[in-house]
Amino acid sequence: MAHWMEFQVQEEYAQAMRFYRHVVERGGRVILKEIRAPKTKWSSLLEVFEDALVHESEVTRRIHKIGEIAEEEGDRAAQSMLSWFYDERVEEEAQIGEIRDLLKMIGDNLAALLHIDAKLGARVPMSPPPAESTAPQRFLRAIKKRLKSLARFFRQQLRTYVTAS
C-alpha cells in the first residue's frame, strides 16, 4: 500500500501543479499560505483510508465551489480547466472508497491484506512533472512533505502486520 500511496503523492503533486500553472499562465500570482500539518498517526490502515476519503470529499467540495465561482464570473478558461478535475474527483473518491471497503471486508486477515498490497503495488507511475516547472521550491516541498506522511505510515503498518503474524 505504501507503493500505491507513493504514486498517489505524484498524482496529487501533478494536480496541484495544474492549478498553479493555470493561475500563472493567466497572469495571476500564487500566494502560498501556511498549511496545517497533517495527521501522522492512525490506529489502522482502515482508518487511513477512511480519513483519506473524507479528505478527498472535502477537496471535491472545494473544487465544485471554485467551479461555481468560475461560472458566476463567466470564466470559461477556468471552467474548461476544472472539467478535467470533475472527472478526476469521481475517480479519486471511487478508488479510495474501494480500498476502504476491501479493508473493511478483510478485517484482520493477513493473507488478504498481503494480496491487496500486492495488487496495489502493481500501480504504474504517472509521468513525472515537467522539469521546467516554475513553482517555488517551498510550495513543492510543502506538498511532498504532507503527502509522504501517508506513504511512511503504510510502510510502518505493513511491517507491523507482517511481524505480528
Identify the meaning behind each predicted range.
Residues 1-165:
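Iron-associated oxidoreductase/ferritin-like identity signal
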